[in-house]
Swiss-Prot record:
One of its GO terms (molecular function) is ATP binding. This is ATP synthase subunit beta. Keywords: ATP synthesis, ATP-binding, Cell membrane, CF(1), Hydrogen ion transport, Ion transport, Membrane, Nucleotide-binding, Translocase, Transport. The gene is atpD. InterPro entries: AAA+_ATPase, ATP-synt_VA_C, ATP_synth_F1_bsu, ATPase_a/bsu_AS, ATPase_alpha/beta_chains, ATPase_F1/V1/A1_a/bsu_N, ATPase_F1/V1/A1_a/bsu_N_sf, ATPase_F1/V1/A1_a/bsu_nucl-bd. It comes from Staphylococcus haemolyticus (strain JCSC1435). GO terms for cellular component: plasma membrane; proton-transporting ATP synthase complex. Pfam families: ATP-synt_ab (PF00006), ATP-synt_ab_N (PF02874), ATP-synt_VA_C (PF22919). ATP binds at residues 155-162. PROSITE patterns: ATPASE_ALPHA_BETA.
Amino acid sequence: MSNGRVTQVMGPVIDVRFEHNEVPEINNALIIEVPKEDGTFELTLEVALQLGDDVVRTIAMDSTDGVQRGMEVQNTGKDISVPVGEVTLGRVFNVLGDTIDLEDKLDGSVRRDPIHRQSPNFDELSTEVEILETGIKVVDLLAPYIKGGKIGLFGGAGVGKTVLIQELINNIAQEHGGISVFAGVGERTREGNDLYYEMRDSGVIKKTAMVFGQMNEPPGARMRVALSALTMAEYFRDEQGQDVLLFIDNIFRFTQAGSEVSALLGRMPSAVGYQPTLATEMGQLQERITSTNKGSVTSIQAVFVPADDYTDPAPATAFAHLDATTNLERKLTEMGIYPAVDPLASTSRALEPAIVGQEHYEVARDVQSTLQKYRELQDIIAILGMDELSEEDKLTVERARRIQFFLSQNFHVAEQFTGQKGSYVPVKTTVADFKDILDGKYDHIPEDAFRLVGSMEDVIAKAKDMGVEV
């Protein structure tokens, strides 16, 4: 293929001039051999713009340290491609599909697919709606996940998005034996490291491929790593007919990386300084995540909400694509309720009688209305105290508090912090237990027995330990 020369370096953005009529296409990968102390290093660039005069503007996938004007650049003539298939399971990759887990490198015969692809055609899409059981009570009852759907985990810093994702990976692998692909997009390297070792210890890693572009990496890598992971997931869906789970932690960092390079590419910023192409970039990623008549990719995306502001363009753009949202609330973490899922703000389009069944729907709505009533009474309680409430309202408050605590749960992945064994609760059990609480069957059991437990059996056992007759 043709060769060019570096004409300008602006941080992660590099301009390259080619011979006339040999200008590479948009999204083509280019390679520069950058000299290092111990030999040379191959830096991959991706063409983002054609500026005219045979010059292209590219985004670097790694640090541009050592790149100088005049250096030779090789055009590969194709997009960045990553390994796909069984060989990816149990391994950790970077954005370019190179293994970074210090084990044997993959051999050259492995199939590689380009990371830029069209979304499935309209006639290939599946129209069936099927619920994905997670074993997490608050999710299964109030905001159930759909197979092949897109789920957003919304929350500010430190409210438990990553722990919830780890628990979901664990539950899906242990209970459903499903394949997961994890994309670490611009998050802490330490968390990725911990996740890898935890998954290795629990054996879940054998069913998981991991792709990382972490906080310390240039924006180019953080911008493309979600596409690399999605390409691996699409192979399992399209070629093997599997139901795959794609975890993206964190989709906000995907947007953030795009905004970092947008100004350097010469684009005029739009609202709050984000890139003008925000909705397009998000759409290109999200439209590829779907169910087809061959299999499904169900995506669970952690969405960091800057300053807890849900009107910020980044989380607001992600919202438009989601089937279900799981909102994490800081107030609940302060009360010691984990997972800190807000039962009134979390939504799902699957919570309909036609999909989940009449009983499930009614119990979920009754739980929400009881909690809503409790929220409305909190001001009165704060000013006048519980004694001023009517007997009916007192009963509502007591049941609402039991429900609130019972929505918390002990997680398998948090065993080392809590010292409690994790629990997986089937949907049927969850619905039956909450129905019993609403009916007043457990009004005599103290509130504290409902904290961080699995099913009602755990509550009864805990109450007996507290010396309460059940």
